[in-house]
Amino acid sequence: ILCYGLWKDYRYSQRKLADFCRKFAEYDERYFNKTYQKLVDELYNYTDWKVEHVKYTKDDYPHYKSKIMQASVEEQMRCANEINALSARYFTYGFCILIEDGFGSKKLTNFKDKAQKRIQSITGDMRTGTINDLWKELATGAGIYIEKPKID
């Protein structure tokens, strides 16, 4: 989502996208399995907003009498929470990199708003595509190939 938005909305070149991805990998290496609260605070101080992850609870999902169905729902909830926690972390990394690259508070907020709309377009009830569509367009249009995550 971040690279796609930078390419599509801000005309980042292949070189600038590759540099962004390199910096992102450095952040991930530096903060992997560590707290990143310092980054959250820096982002908030700069923009007056932060990327938050609100955990799903059992109240957000239907309850089934069947133990198998209920176990399936609980696993779905666990996976959704894990994905959302990583997404909050990764968006925070990306926004902090853009601050380093000179994005002002208003420009960064505009970028965040566009990213939220794009996420809604691929995950919401009225979705118009998938993350794979964006991934393919980024690979063919910008020449940036982003490895897909390996899922255990």
Locations of the language-model features?
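Long, low-complexity interaction regions most often at the N-terminus
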Residues: 10, 16, 28-31
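Intrinsic disorder/low-complexity detector
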Residues: 1-4, 35-97, 124-152
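Surface-exposed, Lys/Arg-rich phosphate-binding patches that contact polyanionic backbones
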Residues: 101
